Amino acid sequence: MLLNGPIWILLDSSAFGGIESHVLELAKGLTSHDQLVTVMFLSSYKPEPPLMAQLRDANIKIEVLDQTYTNSSFWLRLKQAITEAKVRPVVIHAHGYKANILLRITRLLAVTDKIKLVCSFHAGETPTGRVRWYDALDRFSAFLTEQRICVSRKIQSKLPCSSQLINNFVPEASLVESTGNNIAFVGRLSEEKGPDVFVSIANQMPETPFHIFGSGKMEPELTKIKSNNVTFHGHQTDMASIWPDIDILLITSRYEGLPMAALEAMSRGIPIISFALGELPSLIDSGRNGWIVDSRQQMIECLRHWRALTHSEKMHIKIQAQQTIEQNYSTQVVIPQMLAMYQR
């Protein structure tokens, strides 16, 4: 059932990561289901966040609050956007701690009557420094929104109030046949993502090419310890042209919810070898569509096992991986669930 009014998606974005990838697919998915969508950015950044260009390419309306409402303070801009809107939104869906907190403050200002307020929790790790306090405020004020969405049971367990578990999702994609034996890491080069684990595995398999797609504060350290078979490709804003060159994806994180990179890979039939993190054991049926392992050594053993398989054996696993996404983690499956949740 369609919603009778606009949906606003609210976030703060300066780079492109898991939240941005999710918001892009959410906006595109809702639009494909004939919903009116505006993605509201809290603040402007230089250079412009990559998500903005991708939304424009998809003909999705965007608005930047600090550009439109220049005379309001940060905490009052969403209130002004609501009160001045020609057509008020029926749903505002926030992503990330800044957007979540702003949405709840706006509710306390008594301007959200008849608007369904929804917040999503994406992060599986516990942040450090000042962000740790914002994260705590985000979680303990979550009751001020009508619906709360988590992408993993572990994230759910950190909330002091009830929430809905809704899978991350990606559009269906064509099966790719890799042109080589390339092993990939896709993500931010930070402690929680475990790129150092990826490099240590690569160092033990010098005959196999390993590729890192991403950037972050650990890059200088990683370049010092890597072997010659590891190539750094830097931050990527669009992996579509990259996936056909990837044979298998390793997820070496220390914390995860349900990473978008895993879904994007499997939607193309690229199997994953991962530690048992977040919802990945629900996504991966070990030995059928990928592998869940307990240690670095098991990850190496799985890689060698994969390389020893025949072409037909590999294709069977690739097809199973792709079908898992189509049946449980695709836009066509999850967007109707999201729309139903908006209307509860």
Predicted regions and their residues:
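Conserved acidic donor-binding segment of nucleotide-sugar-dependent glycosyltransferases
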Residues: 286-297, 305-311
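A conserved mid-protein helix/loop that constitutes part of the nucleotide-sugar donor-binding site
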Residues: 17-28, 185-204, 212-220, 263
